[in-house]
């Protein structure tokens, strides 16, 4: 596997709609104001977070159980800014919809702007053949409240192209998060 360049990303997005909406450059300003960048970079794509968030709460005394997830553990927020409480965690969804080619695997890493503020973004790999909006897991590791800006960059996706197609794509395995259109909570 080798990492894919901006040329490859642009070509796949223009010809195969791998990312929609797609921005073929780095955007660092909007309406004359600095923002957290998004769009194509040298060897990746900086994704944006939508305005749909769910923050974990302990109001109902729930236990987080991935096998029997209790939606009372979360508070829904739809806003241009999400404030994550100290040492807390939020889920969000990307603005971009992805269609991953059958010989490609992605890895997503956080942006340094947020990382230097103690905000860690975790996203599991986008597997070959997967498509959908990506769910983002965002941790505020600081003892202070932390802001997340909707519509701005949140993480970078790196694309790795295999020498051959895999035997079973995510779609062929009927992956449980295939074609997710909303902020999907844990499924078994």
From Swiss-Prot:
Pfam family, one: DCD
Superkingdom to which the source organism belongs: Bacteria
Entry EC number(s): 3.5.4.13
Alphabetical keyword list: Hydrolase, Nucleotide metabolism, Nucleotide-binding
Reaction it catalyzes: dCTP + H2O + H(+) = dUTP + NH4(+)
Gene Ontology biological-process entries: dUMP biosynthetic process; dUTP biosynthetic process; nucleobase-containing small molecule interconversion
Residues bound to dCTP: 111-116, 135-137, 156, 170, 180
Catalytic residues, chain numbering: 137
Molecular function GO terms recorded: dCTP deaminase activity; nucleotide binding
This protein's pathway: Pyrimidine metabolism; dUMP biosynthesis; dUMP from dCTP (dUTP route): step 1/2
Function: Catalyzes the deamination of dCTP to dUTP.
Subunit text: Homotrimer.
Family: Belongs to the dCTP deaminase family.
NCBIfam families: dCTP_deam
Name of the protein in its database record: dCTP deaminase
